[in-house]
From Swiss-Prot:
Claim: Protein transport is one of the keywords in the record: no
NCBIfam families xref list: PRK10792.1, PRK14186.1, PRK14189.1
Organism: Polynucleobacter necessarius subsp. necessarius (strain STIR1)
Descriptive protein name: Bifunctional protein FolD
Subunit organization: Homodimer.
Example GO biological process: purine nucleotide biosynthetic process
Family affiliation: Belongs to the tetrahydrofolate dehydrogenase/cyclohydrolase family.
Pathway(s) the chain acts in: One-carbon metabolism; tetrahydrofolate interconversion
Assigned GO CC terms: cytosol
UniProt-listed PANTHER family: C-1-TETRAHYDROFOLATE SYNTHASE, CYTOPLASMIC (PTHR48099:SF5), C-1-TETRAHYDROFOLATE SYNTHASE, CYTOPLASMIC-RELATED (PTHR48099)
Gene3D superfamilies: Leucine Dehydrogenase, chain A, domain 1, NAD(P)-binding Rossmann-like Domain
Keywords: Amino-acid biosynthesis, Histidine biosynthesis, Hydrolase, Methionine biosynthesis, Multifunctional enzyme, NADP, One-carbon metabolism, Oxidoreductase, Purine biosynthesis
Presence of the UniProt keyword Oxidoreductase in the record: yes
One Pfam family from the record: THF_DHG_CYH_C
Length: 284
């Protein structure tokens, strides 16, 4: 029997209704949630992502600012712009779309964002706080994955979770969130020997490698929850994940589709983080 689909679009719609209601309440009290999105260069995927983020803001009643710059923008100019946004009381979240042009140091830029406005959760202060379970903001993609597990009331405590991919953006924070929820966690990377040995042992399998269809059905435990974070464009123009959906869906108990799984949830959790930043600002 095919796996149950974990529909990120449907879950996002439900959560965004809640976000819009809370946004209306905080706005009525004089603090409209505000998100500034900065994109440097003309990466086509980045343009699509920022457009989706700005539209999502509008849909839930947020104030949004989209700042587009050419790839020639200097690092110091970008840092100066971030400093201005840090000081702007109408802006509660600042997001710099990655990747940045090679002459700009991403780490320097991300560290320049005030931690209380770092709604992506990438600032080292927020990453460190996540490690000890006191994070201001959870990184949006892992946060979205946890919400997906929550939506099916999956018993995470004592479950064996395997994460394929050890990035700072997905793999490492995902491990922290699952650990805090009581799972036994294994992180696999490009040096891992006998990857299938680990993936076949996973009750919860999270894949974030950027390699199309690298996890096939024979690498999945029967009945597992499979969360596919990858989004890859094939030569024929079609999108696919890092999991071979067509074989994995006959083995897994639950699986996220690509597109329409984790992607919409990432944007929804960005909205949630921005809302929470605004609610916090309204109390001060």
């Amino acid at each position: 029997m095919p796996a149950q689909l974990l529909d990120g679009n449907a879950l996002s719609k439900k959560l965004r209704t809640e976000i819009a209601a809370r946004s209306a309440i905080v706005t009525a009290k004089g603090t409209r949630p505000g998100l500034a999105v900065i994109v440097v260069g003309d990466n086509p995927a980045s343009q699509v992502y920022v457009r989706n983020k700005v539209k999502a803001c509008e849909d839930v009643g947020f104030h949004s600012v989209l700042e587009r710059y050419t790839a020639e923008l200097g690092e110091e100019e970008l840092l100066a712009r971030i400093a201005t946004l840090n000081a702007d009381p109408a802006i509660h979240g600042i997001l710099v779309q990655l990747p940045l042009p090679e002459h700009i140091a991403s780490e320097r830029v991300l560290e320049a964002i005030a931690p209380e406005k770092d709604v992506d959760g990438f600032h080292v202060a927020n990453a460190g706080a996540l490690m000890v379970g006191q994070s201001e903001f959870k990184p949006c993609t892992p946060y979205g994955c946890m919400k997906i597990l929550e939506s099916i009331e999956y018993p995470i405590r004592s479950a064996r979770a395997v994460i394929v991919g050890a990035s700072n953006i997905v793999g490492k924070p995902m491990a922290m969130l699952l650990l805090q929820a009581g799972a036994t966690v294994t992180i696999c990377n490009s040096k891992t020997r006998d990857l299938a040995h680990h993936t076949k042992d996973a009750d919860i399998l999270v894949v974030a490698t950027g390699k199309p269809k690298m996890i096939s059905g024979d690498m999945v435990k029967n009945g597992a929850v499979v969360i596919d974070v990858g989004i890859n464009r094939l030569p024929d123009g079609k999108l696919c994940g890092d999991v071979d959906f067509d074989t994995a869906k006959y083995v897994a108990g639950w699986i996220t589709p690509v597109p329409g799984g984790v992607g919409p949830m990432t944007i929804t959790m960005l909205l949630m983080n921005t809302l929470e930043a605004a609610e916090k600002a309204a109390k001060h």
